[in-house]
Amino acid sequence: MEFNDMTSDITGGVKEYDIATNGISLHVTEQGAGPAVLFCHGFPDTSYTWRRQMNAIASAGYRAIAPDMRGYGRSSAPADASLYTPLHTTGDLIGLLDALKISSAVLVGHDWGATHAWNAALMRPDRFKAVFGLSVPFVTRGESSVFERMRESGRQDDFYMFEQIRPDADQIWADAAVTIPGILYWASGSAPEGEQWSPLDRTRSLYRAAPGPLPSWAEADYVAHNIAEFRRTGFHGGLNYYRAAEPYFTLSAPWKGAKITQPSFFIWGKSDGLKELYPFTLQQMRAGLPGLMGGLELDNVGHWVQHEASAEVSEQLVRFLRTVDAVLS
């Protein structure tokens, strides 16, 4: 493994560096000192999505570490979709901890990043001592994949993941100046009821242009950053996670029925379109998360909880970290 510090100084306690591990290079942003907290972003995003939460936990005495996940930002982006399974992302995260000589960390994940976090905790409970998930809950591996279930129910023409793996998906997303504001708006709680993104209705897709300026929670510097990054990289790497999802289901057979026993917490938006797909009650979640310490549904919030309710998410995260410290000490 190689560690290459990309900054000669630290501005506002934030530093960036590259780590070569697991066959790729990860670009990492870090802030603070103390027990390690590892942040995993989703689609279409970069580590910059976490800047508010990173600042909050660094101020509370924790070490916030956020990579651009493989396929995104300034990290490597293999073209081969088979290299984007949870086996690969868990390997990336373990390699990151090893390079930084960190024995264990708490995971925080949003969207696909929540999937990465849940799976890493499932596969390596010795290295990941707790999980704080946003927007995508953990569901134990069952008998069939979501793709199979959608085909069997005749919803293959409606289900959004089939759109994400179309041969022309890269081109559909390519105009980042349109698609980045669009997904932020339509998947949020700010979009009008009945028009918000639905994963099962193609007329309410993620591809629609935003109707006007974004709400204030979508901070201009964050939106501009994402537009610039995806103009530079394209969307192929991020879309590869969707392409890898169905093939990985077969590989995940060893974890059929397996549960995550570490302490966990889950936050979701009441207006998140993913509620059409996943169980969003604490009772249902505890079937796979016996260590679930609680959860929170946020009113008037959609998929982008770390932005739409930034202060609340940061407060809940710091509270969870302190509770985990007390429980595991």
From Swiss-Prot:
EC number: 3.3.2.10
Keyword set, alphabetical order: Hydrolase
Molecular function via GO: hydrolase activity
Disulfide bonds: none
InterPro entries: AB_hydrolase_1, AB_hydrolase_fold, Epox_hydrolase-like
SUPFAM superfamilies, A to Z: alpha/beta-Hydrolases
Signal peptide: none
Sequence ranges assigned to domain AB hydrolase-1 in this UniProt record: 35-308
Active site: 111 (nucleophile), 242 (proton donor), 303 (proton acceptor)
Catalyzed reactions: an epoxide + H2O = an ethanediol; (R)-styrene oxide + H2O = (R)-styrene glycol; (S)-styrene oxide + H2O = (S)-styrene glycol; 3,4-epoxy-1-cyclohexene + H2O = cyclohex-3-ene-1,2-diol
Keyword Hydrolase: yes
Lyase listed as a keyword: no
Family of this protein: Belongs to the AB hydrolase superfamily. Epoxide hydrolase family.
Quaternary data: Homodimer.
Function summary: Catalyzes the hydrolysis of various epoxides into diols. In vitro, shows the strongest activity toward aromatic and cyclic aliphatic epoxide compounds, since it shows strong activity toward (R)-styrene oxide, (S)-styrene oxide, and 3,4-epoxy-1-cyclohexene, but very weak activity toward (R)-epichlorohydrin, (S)-epichlorohydrin, and 1,2-epoxy-9-decene.
Identification of the protein by name: Epoxide hydrolase
